[in-house]
Amino acid sequence: MNDAKNRPSEFDLIEELFVPLAKSHAGAAELKDDCATLSVSRGYEALYSMDTLVEGVHFFKDDPANLIAKKLLRVSLSDLAASGGVPKGYLLALSLPADISYEWLQSFAAGLSDDQAGYNITLLGGDTTSTTGSLTLSLTAVGEIPAGRAIRRSGAVVGDD
């Protein structure tokens, strides 16, 4: 990995790698605003699930970036599915140490792009920052479900499929 000096600025990274992931949703405002909008269908409720992956805890430093991206997205999407919901989009937060290269970030964005297409979702917004600690990636999946129909963990019983 290269150092942060060889990486584009935060705003250039967003423009080059992440705005393309947000183009299909008008509410994402091409990531130029601090908030995104998302309509929920009449008679539905919104679902949210957030997960964080930390280098050295949830993945190894040499794991392929595209696979880390897919893991990050899928752990939150699986929570929505377990609740009976349909995914609509996601928010992404990246805390990047200086040794993360632009090539690593390109591969990470490509992994997100692949899964976005498969799950018919889009990036809605997020945050990027630098850190002196480990690479830390957080994702909040956003979905919807008919009002009152969310499947809760507290309602599970032995033998449920």
Stretch-by-stretch model annotation:
Residues 1-67, 83, 92, 114-115, ...:
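Extreme N-terminal cap/leader segments of soluble proteins
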Residues 7, 42, 74, 149-153:
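Arginine residue identity/basic-tract feature
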Residues 12-16, 75, 79, 111, ...:
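Alpha-helical scaffold segments in soluble metabolic enzymes
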Residues 46, 53, 88-161:
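Glycine-rich anion-binding loops of enzyme active sites
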Residues 72-83, 119:
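A short, N-terminal amphipathic alpha-helix
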